[in-house]
Amino acid sequence: MDIRLLSKSFFVRRLGLDDVDIIYDISCKNEIFYEYHPPFVTKQSITEDMEALPPNKSYDDKYYIGFFENNTLVANMDLILDYPTEKIAFIGLLMVNILYQNNGVGSKIVCDTCVYLKELGYKKIRVGVDKENPQSTYFWSKNGFKIISEKEYNVMELVL
């Protein structure tokens, strides 16, 4: 996968340990997310997220990526390919910089990501949403995702 093709508007690259400070900066400002998804972010929790893998997945399938405008981190995404099954992509996190929220940037990133993943042959995209978080549920719903399972997290899915 060529991650640069996940967005038509932003420069996309993998994020690594050198990026923890800028990820932490945008994460800290997204306080509403952490009201529903405690504990509050730490630099260690970011590092752990970068390394976390679901069962039976390898780092070849994981893309912890940033979307940049000039040198500013606009959003970060944790994307797992072929999870939970083949031809389903799973977005474990999409965090949009608060300075870019409420103007369609997150939706544009989701739309571009969906278009590219469909070109690659993916059939569905799933996300896990904190059950009590109305802001996240609304965001994913307005982007065409439907709740397919309600447990601790709502699993939402978009058929491509």
Predicted regions and their residues:
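Active-site acidic-Proline motif in GNAT/NAT acetyltransferases
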Residues: N97-L99, N103, K131-E132
